[in-house]
Amino acid sequence: AFEAGADYCTVLGCTDLLTIEGCLKAAEKAGRRLFVDMITVEDMDARVRQLEAIGVTHIAAHTGTDRQAAGGTPLEDLCILKAAAKKSVISVAGGIRPETVETYLAAGADVVIVGGGICHADDPAAAARAIWDKLQGE
């Protein structure tokens, strides 16, 4: 992915630490960044400690679409990650829309990732503008 121009890559946080270390080394070699996606990770506190111990600096709270359909959001996971991380950038993804983005900013998200909140909006351009404005504090 890095050879194709990607600035970031993602690896699942539930995978083996050796796999994550390999991905981290590839990112470092390319001068790029790796995000560890914590979707389905059960003991986030312990996993964050393990990840930071091997040099991970970017961790993502992420709620999948099935969990969103059942009413789940990434807010609780974001709060857990923010409390557990000592030196990592924490991103949030999953179900974020223009009307909810401020909640995640207030909870301390360093990076907000929006997909369906733009792509599935009635007016994707307006949704993107609204999110951008909120990220800029407008």
Q: Where are each of the predicted segments found?
A:
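C-terminal helical cap(s) of enzyme catalytic domains, especially alpha/beta-barrels
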Residues: 23, 78, 105, 116-138
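A C-terminal functional module that forms or caps the active site or interfaces directly
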Residues: 77-105, 112
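A general structural signal for short secondary-structure boundary/capping elements
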Residues: 37, 82-86, 108, 126, ...
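As written
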Residues: 6, 107-109
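Short Gly/Pro-enriched loop/turn and capping motifs at secondary-structure junctions
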Residues: 64-67, 95-99, 118-119
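Conserved active-site and cofactor/substrate-binding residues in soluble primary-metabolism enzymes
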Residues: 18, 46, 73-76, 99, ...
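Conserved anion-binding
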Residues: 1-87
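Thr-Gly-centered strand-to-loop micro-motif
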Residues: 11, 37, 91-93, 114-115, ...
